[in-house]
Amino acid sequence: MVDKLTLGKKLVGLLKKRYPGPSPHQERPVLETLLYAICLEDASVEQAETCFARLLSAFHDLNELRVSSITELATVFDGLASADWRAHRVRNVLHYVFEKNFEFAFESLRRKTLELATKQLFKIRDLSPFDRNYTLQSALGTHVIPVDRLMTNAAIWLGLAATGETPEQAAETLKSAVRKADVPVFAHYLRCLAVDPRLVKAFEPGKHASAATADPQTMNERLETLFKEADAAARKAGKKPAPGRAAVRTADGRERPTGGGGSKAGRTRDARGAAPARKRK
């Protein structure tokens, strides 16, 4: 019988060497956590931080965000896939929270049981499984694994999830590989691997290893081989290493580079407050 807990720890140990630096420690109000999850799905931490900062600084306050058009909100997610879909979910979240509480606060979710909190999040239209699980794990500390599409692709390649599993199914499968206390660190390093632009194509569904070779007991050895091949290809192409940066694909199927650019977050605030109004010309 495969001891997935031990394999999960060994995987994290290997990924820490590949992607050095501390895993981010997120402490946000529940509403901000939910909005951040929308930024983070299928993106790198750097991209998510940039988009989240834009979200809080590009509009006068959260009410202006709530009443803005999808087109206006989508500009916040420039450089990420599915910008309109992210904008749609942001607006749905803000509509739900404001109409329920008549303010932009959602801290009551922390006081609910996992069952009741999950039911409440399901009432917000069009949230993804990742949005819900990230919020439940971050705000309530529950034993759920926030897994998005790219992370699922990587988990299947590793052999930790079965071929064809959806992110929701993979999240349940991965629980056996991670202790509750280790979920944030495990999820962070799995994300680093999943969005690495050198590797993301290797994890695409059509390129997954067969069931016979996608053995979780050999995943570290296979990963080390993949790292060497990807690094050699990058050196041959004259590219510098850029682990942890997400590959963003445009509508025509081409990849475009991503940076930490975009609007500077000149103003930040708690999700319940508002930034000072900008001067208008």
Predicted features, each with a name:
Residues H143-I145, R149-S210:
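Compact, basic/aliphatic-enriched, mixed alpha/beta core segments that act as assembly/interaction modules
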Residues M1-R111, A181, H188-K281:
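N-terminal polyanion-binding entry modules of DNA glycosylases/AP lyases
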Residues L34, I38-C39, V90, T113-G159, ...:
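Catalytic DNA-binding helix-loop module of base-excision-repair DNA glycosylases/AP lyases
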